[in-house]
Amino acid sequence: FTVALAAAEALKEQGITPNACAGFSLGEICALTFSGAFSQEEGIRLVCRRGELMQEAAEKHPGAMAAVLKLPNEEVEKLCSSFSEIWPVNYNCPGQLVVAGNPAQMPDFCKAVEAASGKARPLAVGGGFHTPYMQEASAAFLKILEDGEFSVNLPEIPVYANKTARLYGDPDKKETLAELLSAQIQNPVRWQEIMERLLAEGFDCFIELGPGKTLTGFGKRLIKGHEAKLLHVEDEKSLNETLAALGVQ
């Protein structure tokens, strides 16, 4: 959170401001904070509270996660429907969808993936995040957002929501910012759909902020057939490289 926010502020100091923002899972709070929905202090506090609530839920309802590779999303969804407690949770990019759910059912699910000519890679995580196992955490986080302790504002820069892959404040969607952000905890992250929507709307430069290049990796598959640029900022070196790529001296 802090590295990504610092990277965004560093770009802003050089005159680089986004036309839209999106964050993956926890990163959505960072995107909303930078966009003015929360102060920086509030953003940090929300990240901490969210983590505590999700950890409590994971301890109460243990879960497992696995990345499914080399299968269409629709086929993975169909496989999930054959299990009572396995759900698609992270739509990352074509050919990669993360699932989560009951640890007792996961081995058989992974065998079903392999039988369908896909690949299943168990993930070393402590819970079934973005599933109904997180319902109590989601409800508690909504209460925190609505009880008046935090100033919740509509973002000044457009932000795309993980739950809907649509903008916060979309007139076609009736959910408030607090409802969308809290519901994200127990619903899938629709990253692939967000990126596809941005590309369809004409966005052609994407800058990943924070440690690592995971989203950039997803982006390489998502921008195929598009004239689009993928950049990232995680330290001074990558900041300078990104500024150079943007023509900022």
Task: Name each model-derived stretch.
Residues A165-R166, P188, G212-L215:
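Short Gly/Pro-enriched loop/turn and capping motifs at secondary-structure junctions
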Residues F1-E75, A120, C205-K237, L243, ...:
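FabD-like malonyl-/acyl-CoA
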